[in-house]
Amino acid sequence: MSTQYDSDSSPAASNSGSADPALAELAQQWQSLADQVRHHREVYYYGNPEISDAEFDALLTRLQEFENSHPEAVTGPSPTTEVAPSPPESSPFRNVDHQEPMLSLDNVFDTEQLSSWLDRTPAKTYLTELKIDGASINLLYRNGVLELALTRGDGTTGEDITHNARTLSDIPARLQPSEDFPVPEIVEIRGEVFIRVEDFAKMNAQRQAEGQKMFANPRNAAAGAMRQKDPAETARRPLRLICHGIGAREGFTPASQHAAYEALAAWGLPVSPYTKQVHSAKEVLEQVAYWADHRHDADHEMDGLVIKVDDTESQQRLGTTSRAPRWAIAYKYPPEEARTRLHDIRLGIGRTGRATPYAVMEPKYVAGSTVTMATLHNPSEAHRKGVRLGDEIMIRKAGEVIPEVLGPVEDARNGAEREFLFSSLCPECGTPLAPARGDDADWRCPNTRYCPGQLHTRLTYIAGRGAFDIDALGEKAAYDLIHSGVLPDETGLFSLTEEDLRRTDAYTTKSGALNKQGETLLTTLAAAKEVDLWRVIVALSIRHVGPTAAKALANHYGSIPDVAAADVETMSTVDGVGPIIAESVRDWFAVSWHQEIVDAWAAAGVRMEQDVTEQPSADAAGSIQADLLAGLSIVVTGTLEDFDRSSAKEAIESRGGKATGSVSKKTDYLVAGAKAGSKLTKAEELGIPVLDEAGFHKLLSEGPGKGDAEED
């Protein structure tokens, strides 16, 4: 299917066997790169990509750089000057020319490149809009009636998919008349067909239930749907349209891109709600930064931000190249999804004994970092996704979120892939794994005290900034303390001596003397004995008890023995605790070896008490409920006096709310501290209630309607 150009007919090729073997070698390198670009561009446009978007972008950039360095090696038409592959002769669809070429966009990949483009392309007003990851379409309306729907094709000629396009509810058969924008005699409308993220998940779930193959991503599903021979199959997919441009037109000349979008909306066509006019290069860069942090606020997948000169006269003056307008550019974000190969599946054991399967993969750059492992969540989920050893798989990593495996690329299988069988034994200690409850999807290791895997994660948690904040006790050092036999559990942590540390590799020199890291550990352990009581409570690793609940318990009871002696009913009334946390505290202290930890730390000098700063009141009973904020989506931004990011999140979630990182129409409250920034601006634009820190405290204690910011 891939278009091939005959390099043997070119001048460079005809001379390759004679005068200049070096030039012939360069020409062969160019031809190989050009063929790869054409092949991958073609399979992408027809919904069957073999590499990720980022890998294709890198391949195209490599070809462009090669041509810039060796122009003499270019032996024929280059894909760097082409929009897309021509429709194949074997296509079941009729090939039709566009009224006006349907060009692509040039890309930039960092703010330095974007700033350079902005310097070359100054404008009073720019338009920024999301780059939708879908399938391009060109709609031709004559006297307001839909006449043709074409794919982009090679930019000059596309495939006639009119019958399929008519099944989309977003594509009107007739444009609505408008007093402000009369319907022109002829107009080409360019847009993107896509599937919303929410609809894609529902569609794939239904396909799985029906035993059908699931789609790898919304873009492939949308592109494939538009090229179905049977329009009824197209109609079964939840396709949507966003219009983002106008091609040929007669009787209509908009003054700006923004005015063109107003006309499209007036005619009954969908336009993006995420488009924004900005008036400087600085504002463009601010939009780029904003959407880098808010990619998931949109209801569709997006892989970049498109920047356009708004003024139509300026667009005409700037003109186009053979493949793209000079007045527009696409800023491409680092990919959040990537394709790689699965080498192995292993089990990791967490702090609470949970066994989490994770994939070991070929290294892949995704969302700004190179990843080699990705979670499969639990054995049931791993089986559901159907991954096999040796599979090519799709992975996703959004920002700082742990990478996850989306599923296998089934079309890439060659029969050499192998089923993976999960061991029923803990990989760390050999204890049989079992669900904590009959309906629990997670497997757990019941050897809580002595399992090296659980102890390792508990030690690093104890040493973390949210607990004792112990320097020189990182993951490698914790591993060494455990596997050298120095610490069979956390009981002896505060009794460690120089002699103990000399039995480890992490804390000794080659001669066996205590090294600087060992000295630092002993110093910080001594200092940690005097930390605030709430940090000690956090370090006990009680389920559901983070900094917020720990502070509430410390302030209310004043000592670890009093916390241990409290009954669930009374503890449930403590502001910031509630019944779920109270039951978890009771269950933790009911385990005999947990009390041994408390006793050993106390004997070693860890402070186990403080002054009581809050007394229970009769009115407190039932005031804090686990569902106080149920159903509410809350965003915290800026700097707060009484909360860091994790404790604010815990305070919301312990009351049944959802703590999210970005503002959208679904956000119920924004809590704004100092230096709140763009999230505050967006919340105000959307009319979302904004709370200061005092209002946040009221919301946490009294629920919605009581902690709202007062109106002027």
UniProtKB/Swiss-Prot annotation:
SUPFAM superfamilies xrefs: BRCT domain, DNA ligase/mRNA capping enzyme, catalytic domain, Nucleic acid-binding proteins, RuvA domain 2-like
Recorded GO MF terms: DNA ligase (NAD+) activity; metal ion binding
PROSITE patterns cross-referenced by the UniProt entry: BRCT, DNA_LIGASE_N1
Active-site residues (renumbered): K131
InterPro entries reported in the protein's UniProt record: BRCT_dom, BRCT_dom_sf, DisA/LigA_HHH, DNA_ligase, DNA_ligase_AS, DNAligase_adenylation, DNAligase_N, NA-bd_OB-fold
Domain BRCT: 624-712
UniProt family annotation: Belongs to the NAD-dependent DNA ligase family. LigA subfamily.
Listed name of the protein: DNA ligase
